[in-house]
Structures are given as C-alpha cells and as structure tokens.
Amino acid sequence: MENKFTPFIGIEYIKFGSDRSDVNISINSDSEVFTRNEIAENSTDYYKDLGFFVEYDSNNKCEAIEFTKDSGLLYEGRNLFDLSYSKLRTIYDSISNEMEEEDKLGCTYHDLGFAVSKSTEDDNIESVLIFSKNYWR
C-alpha cells in the first residue's frame, strides 16, 4: 500500500492529533502495542501487516508515524522507498532549510516534516518517520 503524506498533517486516514481509538478504527487492523524506549511518553502501535508504527503523545494523540521499507510512502508524487538514500538527499537537501544529519545514520528535514533512517550496510532507506509540528519540541 502506498501512503500519501502531507507534512505536519499525516496521511489520508491518519491525521496528527487524532485520538488513538480513532486511529485504530480507521486502520481496522491488528497491532502490537509496546514502549519503544525509556523516554517515550506513551506506547506505540505497530501494524506489522501494513509496515508502520504509530506513536502517541501523553494524551493518546497521534504525533508521528514511522514507515518501514515494507510499506510505501508517497511525498510529492515520489515513493521515498524507491529512492536511494543519496538520491533522496540530493533532492531534498536542496529544498530544505532545516536539514539535520544524524551521526551518518540518517537525517531529519524539520521544515518538511520527515526524517529518514538509512542502512549502515548500503545506500538503502530503512525507515521514514513523518511527524507533527510539535514532535521535536
């Protein structure tokens, strides 16, 4: 499934700020609930069959969605997983005014609303995180 995303808004059927119960209803698929790390404000829902994770803030509102290479994510007509990491950087580094490289593991485009994790073994994209305006604050 290819998911079209709009920066700081979400995808067609999951909008940032949506309540967890509304997200679960709109997805209508089984999820695994777990806590990602010790600094997480809330648990995360992993939809393995769909290839993405949904993160929630302390008020159970959707604040980010992380897509794995098992899913599709369209931005401006491009499936980001069809691009190599270096090609993605060539395209979006020239557009973004707020790109932050993260220890050669990936980068975040704060002004475009997404972050990319790359493989340490090759130039492939491992995951893409799309986020709400307040996610990094």
Where on the chain are the PLM-derived regions?
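Short helix/turn-capping signatures at newly exposed starts of structured segments
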Residues: 1-137
